[in-house]
From Swiss-Prot:
Alphabetized UniProt keyword annotations: Cytoplasm, DNA damage, DNA excision, DNA repair, Excision nuclease, SOS response
Recorded name of the encoding gene: uvrC
Protein name, entry field: UvrABC system protein C
Top-rank taxon: Bacteria
Span of domain GIY-YIG: 32-110
A Gene Ontology molecular function term of the record: DNA binding
Residues annotated as domain UVR: 219-254
Amino acid sequence: MSDQLPDASAQPPDPAQAEPFDPKPVIARLPGLPGVYRYIDSAGNVLYVGKARNLKKRVSSYFNKTQLSPRIAMMVAKIARIDTTVVRTEAEALLLENNLIKALAPRYNILFRDDKSYPFLKLTGHRFPRMAYYRGATDRKHQYFGPFPSAYAVRESMQILQKVFQLRTCEDTVFNNRTRPCLLHQIHRCTGPCVGAISEADYARDVGNAASFLQGRETEVLEGLQSKMEEHAMQLEFEQAAAVRDQIAALSTVLKRQAVEEVGQARDIDVLAVAVEGGRACVNLAMVRGGRHLGDKAYFPAHADEAAMIVEDGDEGAEGGETEPAPAVPLGVERIAARVLSAFMVQHYLDQAPPPIIVVSHVPDDAALLEALALHAGRKIALVRQPQGQRKAWLEMAQQGAALALARRLSEQGSQEARTRALAETIGIDLEDLALLRVECFDISHTAGEATQASCVVFHHHDMQNGEYRRYNIQDITPGDDYAAMRQVLTRRYQKLVELMQEQGGLDPAGEASSPMPHVVLIDGGKGQVEVARQVFEELGLDIGLLVGVAKGEGRKVGLETLVFADGRPSLELGQGSAALMLVAQIRDEAHRFAITGMRARRAKARTTSRLEEIEGVGARRRQKLLTRFGGLRGVMAASIDELASVDGISRGLAEEIYRQLH
């Protein structure tokens, strides 16, 4: 339940005529209820999103200028509008705040970059279940185990299960069409259900044992295997008994290498450790599933130091916000760590279901956090601050991992900032804040003109922003014409930005409040490609000084590249030791990698499905039935007319047409 308050300043003022913002009329209308507030500048950009138990007290605390830190006073000075939403409880406010932070990415909030969903290990619902790596939404048709912190952790578990339980990993289309066992069967990594080498009952027993192992019931699995081995021995089935004995030995070896949670305790645990240094923070998340430590993953928030101080300056006090805010003082490392941990838990666990127990290095400072997580998960969540035994060891490992990851990031950040500065100086860009430097790079990829694809990658805030990468399928050009491909992608990319800038009143493309127009546009190519880019920019009315070509050196050797400028400046050879060239090469190589992977995927898709798609009368369902029945396009091409006609939904006439089209 929410209520958008009326606001006299609901429309962003004209920057040229804006008067100093007067918060008093807005604050006077605010209720003393839970809710979310948003500070917005004169250009309509959201500066900060916060929640409050008492909107009136929280918002008014920011405008007591004698008690604000300099950085927060700078943010308050930019406020031109305040929007608020009233909710029923502080827990609801926390949920709404999280959604808005993720959607709007405000400059002064603690932000964790959205990560793609965590991977799972899947056992399919097939009568001979397949073991597979999986990422995406889950359903009830299959069994899912995880989530795992990384793809490596999933594949490591799959290797263990292959070695111990020998479950199949092949696709169903391959499984349904095999006549001989594959290499995995020969090296004892699969029991060969595809050729009847194991009964359905025995395979189901192996699947059940694998599931029990993943759920942490190792003792139960070992006892069951021991009983099975003795049963085979009693019946003089010594070969089968030896096979089970090998399973027991392999499983025992695995268990000796892993730290396993004590029997009888909760088996699914997350361990969170925070490290803070030099205004940067790292949250290290270690996952324990089924009592087994699956690995960890480091997260680095943006704006941690500034955002923590904003929350402190706007703190409502202990009970319902009755106390006045204390004078601004620098926050200690422990307090910043608690703020960062709260932000991480909200942003992470409202997307990923939390386990029943979370071990933490610091106590989160948000009283509504546990209530919101329990509301979201539908059960209670326990926080453990001072763990004992194995959990204590896991927390110490996570703390050490957080410290090491942060030290590595700070070191990399220093060298990356130096490269950014060198590039800005080389090209002649004057920015007070080098983190704002935005570089976009384009590359064209194809194979002999087939499946031409262009890529655009983005460098911003001293790092590659893979969430902003884009691929463009190039069409209606002469195959292999890289110039036409470059013209098409640049036109498609920047024509939209020009239209957006015109809607915003013709703002300077390099201005802070404008659309995301880059400061530098890198073109992977020499004078010819740069000339095409120059023509496109002139047609669109854009500054050709933004364009820089990266021409390969003699023999295409790395370090001998030349920068080619579209505005008439002489070409520039930077030399192998140039920090600017290192950054240019990094961005250019990433554009090439992104383009070539997309091109290969597109080409593979075209080669495997396009010929069937072109046959009239063969829709998606019939195509899938054909591919499933014959194990792929090659099997369809090898099938006779009678075999094609035997597929459900394929008439004799359609079978003849398919055969004719494929031969």
